[in-house]
Amino acid sequence: MGWSRKDLLHIEDLPAKEIQLILNTAKPMKEIMSRAVKKLPTFRGKSVYNLFFESSTRTRTSFETAAKILGADTSSLAVAQSSLNKGETLLDTVRTLQAMKPDLVVIRHSSSGAAQFLAKELKAGVINAGDGQHEHPTQALLDLYTMQERLGSVEGRKILLVGDILHSRVARSNVWALKNLGAEVVLVGPPTLLPPEIKSWGVKTTFNLDEELPGSDVIMALRLQLERQQSGLLPSLREYSQLYGITAERVKKTGKQTLIMHPGPVNRGVEIESSIANSSQSVIEEQVTNGVAVRMAIMYLLLGGGTAHVVD
């Protein structure tokens, strides 16, 4: 099948066939990353703008690297350096950007729906790199790619998402993506860090991590923002780690070679024990590599690649 979308804004309504097209397109992209010369002429002359109104060196660098390998010109706008600090609205920024005639815009913003607003106003394609607590579609796609690469398929696989579900756009996007591909998703976290609407997500929810460990194929620990303790949502980081930290003892309870994942950056000793983060079952570094390949695939499709065929 071909690709007809102008933007990639969310995963929730993305059909399984389109998800799989992105993942299939990422395979040759990853091979390109292993070449001595990591550069394609595919999108020479195309311009990609990164608008990061939230700080994220890892994600921004991943997108920049992906665009450069594809041969596109990249420009980045960090909020601290932008006119927004002088009272300029997002709409003003959009109009200024439109005048620069970009081909593709990547946006990360603290407000849910910011990427959708941008897509409606711009002729250029838009990629959502995270909007508020709404979604983070490219993270879910790179997570899926990593799981498929290791497991072959996620259909029927038991996937645990552990931690701060309430504030996690990564969790939301992963739930939609994994459900679309037939995985068994279990959300695990303290009651104070589960969203009130979670029953409508259609997946199992529990406060007890240890009960769900047996038979799990993937454990994805979510980043815990340390300010959650200060806001009273957690009694202490020590207690959180005791109840929800991924330790060697807990990994043994799975009874299999369970994959250990994390969107990063990791709070070692809180979300994941260092020995587990560094173990052979951890695919955290693979997620970083696969993130570039998946973002290359998305850019390739949005900029006119249209199919999984890659031009050498």
From Swiss-Prot:
Recorded metabolic or biological pathway in which this protein acts: Pyrimidine metabolism; UMP biosynthesis via de novo pathway; (S)-dihydroorotate from bicarbonate: step 2/3
The protein's Enzyme Commission number: 2.1.3.2
Positions bound to carbamoyl phosphate: R58, T59, R108, H136, Q139, G264, P265
Cysteine pairs bridged by disulfides in the record: none
One GO cellular component, as annotated: cytosol
Key words, A-Z: Pyrimidine biosynthesis, Transferase
Family (UniProt): Belongs to the aspartate/ornithine carbamoyltransferase superfamily. ATCase family.
Free-text function comment from the UniProt entry: Catalyzes the condensation of carbamoyl phosphate and aspartate to form carbamoyl aspartate and inorganic phosphate, the committed step in the de novo pyrimidine nucleotide biosynthesis pathway.
PANTHER family: ASPARTATE CARBAMOYLTRANSFERASE, ORNITHINE CARBAMOYLTRANSFERASE, MITOCHONDRIAL
Oligomer and partners: Heterododecamer (2C3:3R2) of six catalytic PyrB chains organized as two trimers (C3), and six regulatory PyrI chains organized as three dimers (R2).
Name the record gives this protein: Aspartate carbamoyltransferase catalytic subunit
Species name: Desulfitobacterium hafniense (strain Y51)
Lineage: Bacteria, Bacillati, Bacillota, Clostridia, Eubacteriales
